[in-house]
């Protein structure tokens, strides 16, 4: 526009040379940014505008407009005319300024908007144009691409000679492309159909263009017999595409008679048999890289995808060329074709009408032939799809007559054999097929009832569990559960780490079984559990004890209430594990009835003010006294508050015989004594700890915490942290404790005792602890600060020491004058006979323990076994100041010794030498009696393991030999037997391997056999001859625990007696697959009882078992109830049959007629009377059955030509249904023979 004259290329080149490099660089950057903007925004290539063949300089136009403040200011100030003059458009050019405005608004307005304010959504931009600032916008600044062609021009409407608009049918372009026969057009149409066949917003609707399906299969060489035009077009397509599909079908493995029916008779000359391809090798192979095979694969995939849409199924079924193509593909030998074809047929089966003339007369029921071949096939996929197709065909109304005429006893028997295979997918599909067959009425139900063991197998499957199939039963399949949305209440907090196979909340819908499964609602655990450590048994006991006190405190809240000026926080009943309710508005969390600061982690506890109530004041004083005696302030230590409170409650209950205070009062009193103590949440998030408090006396219920001061003592650490089966189970009690690095003397109140006791008065002294190991190994030395007087003791040692004590009722306090010299009572140490190694020289004599203690540390040399036993008894007695009697029990019972000491006298002499204490402890034996030790060499004979099965009494060298003997001699048969082990009272009959497992777990393990051997040696193991089973009662010594009531064990047994009872099979939670299998089998049995008289007769044998299941909580209980009602509601025909049978003359009247057969009345034939006349009327039993009228023109001659086990149909004759059934023995035995299978666990 700058010049009306077009410049030459030379002039443009000269202009570019005159421009400075900076301007050229900016221009290049501008056009590069503009091209990228067009590519990003509209995916278009920038095409510069031209006016009369002259290119418009967009860079100059954009730079000029931006220099004036942008197009909005230019439009508001109406400066477009000034810009036009800059470009050479003067007044002699009409509407030059308008042309400049249109070009800018079309090509550069959006670019300016993005460069200045950024990207704006098109919808927002359009809304801005309708706002109050409309005058600042322009009509020409649209969001459409300026490069699009004919943007404002409407599409051309095709009209006929009358002027009416011609509307082309849907998918007309695809149809024209397929008819054209051009290779590119055909490929393009196939690709478009492939894309439209998939699920999406734009699906291919075949009902709008049914011709499209005919054209698709025509490009595979399959045409309609009535349309010769399509076959002629196929010959033309063959010249252009070079695809010869006749050769492919001739070598595809489709039966010859089917090819001759579907294609033409001339294909017989081109047909390649399997033998021909074996010798000549000229058969075609399926290769997706081949264009012909790829075209077949495309068409089968398109039809398969379209069959999933219900709107397309009817159109596909009514299109005969498509059905013919699917039948041919399902019968071929190439897996990509028959897999897609069988999938499509299984989707279309519910709409296939077997009475259609094309399927009856043209295809000769080829679909039923495919089903027969698939059911008897060894291919799992063909078997499952054939059952699915048969299920769909049975669901179509009108197919009953043809299917019942096609079904036979061999097919039904083979279907029931498939049910017994350990595969969940095959089991589910087979049951669904049998259910649809049983829904067809009397004839089908009679066929199922006549199958041997069919009723028994279905009854056993009513209690089958899917878990019994094992992991291999789920191979190749996946059970998918869909969880609906679940809204929780405000008082629950969902655990984010929910287990998967744990079950999720709500109801789960199972796609495979088609059933709804109600999952149990799982109780949600404590929040904060993601990083929480599991609570130990001791912590659970400790928390339960604390919670009992909290509940007791709620009943007596007013009695122990404090002053109103400093009230306690409100108390609430808390669950066994602390639950946290978060308040988002503040940092406080309600925990155990008290507020907890989330930010600092501290639990605010207010000190307790002095109370005016005398009872409460005494309780506070007693609490303060206990805290002073058992707790010490150490800022670096932390102790669980539950541990402190549990020890406090226990001591007040047993030692002071007083009711303990509440948890809040206990915390307040501790805050009074130690103001710097803070209560905060532990790092694991499940308990509250007292920071700055150390429990100096370990409590029997306290967990083995690493911070506890009780574990600072090595002996206590070993006794507390070890399990009873490995270490000494010592119950620690008392008040004399050694603090680390300092001497602390705590004197208790006077305690009287009736039996010899142990008095401990703290002084710095140590006694080494020697483990009573007969192999001579020493343990760590243990320091102890007490003087020891050992009471009467009995010890049985074998390397493991278990110390037990009785509750302390009283004790005797000696005078302080006699504290340095105490006469001990008689000591009796009983040691059973042991196997002693030669490395230890064991001597029996009166031992004298001389210990030299320097600076509180005692080193004692290695003593004999008796001395070490005395040491461990003394050390344990020193740790437990209230010990009355100590039994050191071990497992060894081979060597028996007795050491009796009548008197022991402990003399302690303290002399100070070189500023060190030297303490000598001397144990004097007044009686000075000694016994000779028996030294018995170890026996070379192994332990005797005896088989006690039904008084067998054969000895073996090891438990494995006994188990082998049992499995080979006593439990060798595959029968359900009772356990005949002498003394076993288990009444459950078991199969062989289940019984062997029971024997191995209960009777034939090493511990049980050793115990029985020892019992026989002692004379108490000779059991009587097998009689009535009896329960053996093992007597135990009653040891009342100081922390529990006398009847605590009885209350616990009564409370938890019914928690661990073995649940019945019907009480187990049914999984979705288990529920589907059980319900389907019960529905089949219900149909058999409803439609078949023979089925009712066989079901009455299982009536008691069915009644038990019908009264259960199973999902199938309702169907079984209907079954029971059908059993006792005989139809009118059956009653009439019984009435007519009653009119038959007796045998006496028949004999009196003397052979006059002409006078005998004829017995009427009925569908269920074939049993009475089986020998004579076996050949005519089927013809007498009242069946639905069917088309006798059906020809099943080609259904089972390749299946030797299936019945052979011939034209004009049909086989008899009541012939002897040919059994098909499965490859593995069916697991469903038993009426009630053994419960295998929770269902899937």
Curated annotation (Swiss-Prot):
What does the UniProt entry say about where the protein is found?
Nucleus
What keywords are assigned to this protein?
Answer: Chromatin regulator, DNA-binding, Nucleus, Transcription, Transcription regulation
Q: Where is the composition biased (Polar residues)?
A: 486-496, 556-566, 610-619, 1159-1186, 1194-1212
Know the name of this protein?
Answer: SWI/SNF chromatin remodeling complex subunit swsn-7
Enumerate the spans annotated as ARID domain. Answer: 24-116
Q: What task does this protein carry out?
A: Involved in transcriptional activation and repression of select genes by chromatin remodeling (alteration of DNA-nucleosome topology). Required for the stability of the SWI/SNF chromatin remodeling complex SWI/SNF-B (PBAF). Required for regulation of a stress response gene network, probably as part of the PBAF complex and perhaps acting in concert with histone demethylase jmjc-1. Binds to the ethanol and stress response elements (ESRE) in the promoter regions of hsp-16.1 and hsp-16.2, probably as part of the PBAF complex.
What species does this protein belong to? Caenorhabditis elegans
| Record carries keyword Nucleus | yes
Taxonomy of the source species: Eukaryota, Metazoa, Ecdysozoa, Nematoda, Chromadorea
GO MF, any single term: DNA binding
Summarize subunit and interaction data from the UniProt record for this chain.
Component of the SWI/SNF-B (PBAF) chromatin remodeling complex.
Q: Which PANTHER family match?
A: AT-RICH INTERACTIVE DOMAIN-CONTAINING PROTEIN 2 (PTHR22970:SF14)
Q: What ranges does the record give for the region Disordered, renumbered to this chain? A: 486-534, 556-583, 597-619, 1134-1244
Question: Might you report a single GO cellular component term?
Answer: brahma complex
